[in-house]
Amino acid sequence: VLLPKQHILLLSHMRAYTSLFSHIIGSNPAVCGYYEMHIGYHSWRSLLRQKLLYFRDEEVKTGFSCMFDKVLHNDHAVSPSVLLRPNTRTIFSLRHPRDTLPSIVTLYQQVDPTNEFNSPDYALDYYVNRLTALSGIATNIEQPFYYLDAEALVENAGECLGSLSDWLR
């Protein structure tokens, strides 16, 4: 159980259809993980920690071979050494700010009116800082990664998921 063959990490930002993506990939019987663990990945030990935390609350799928997680915040660092592991696959996904920023503000106005994300300026700072961090990560890994246009997941799901499936094989 503690040694799946593969890890998939989605590196993105809030409101980029990552929940949709997570439910799609998590519906695969070979994949365990469909929600954000809210942890960093600092070394290979973090991959083990992910499994321990996940299986504390979730059942092991029969025949699973892959763990999935998404990292959406700079508070949860991801080390290049983790992304460079031969059994780790990295997916980056971005959504256009024109749609992302109002979506962040609207969400927090509904769920927590006192949250800082109610401010368009705060949401913009988060988005810019997150994209800067993602750019730095992408620049520093020498292993191929997959870029998923968040809008394509909704607007052209079949082609998008087909391409991703081919890449994951």
Spans of features found by a protein language model:
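PAPS-dependent sulfotransferase catalytic core
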Residues: 1-65
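A generic secondary-structure signal marking the coil-to-beta-strand transition
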Residues: 6, 64-67, 89-90, 144
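Short beta-strand segments
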Residues: 10-12, 67-70, 147-149
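A general marker of short, structured functional hotspots
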Residues: 50, 69, 122-123
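Glycine-rich phosphate-binding loop used to anchor ATP phosphates in small-molecule kinases
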Residues: 60-80
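Generic signature of intrinsically disordered, low-complexity segments enriched in small/polar residues
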Residues: 20, 24, 37, 44, ...
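PAPS-dependent sulfotransferase catalytic domain
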Residues: 73-169
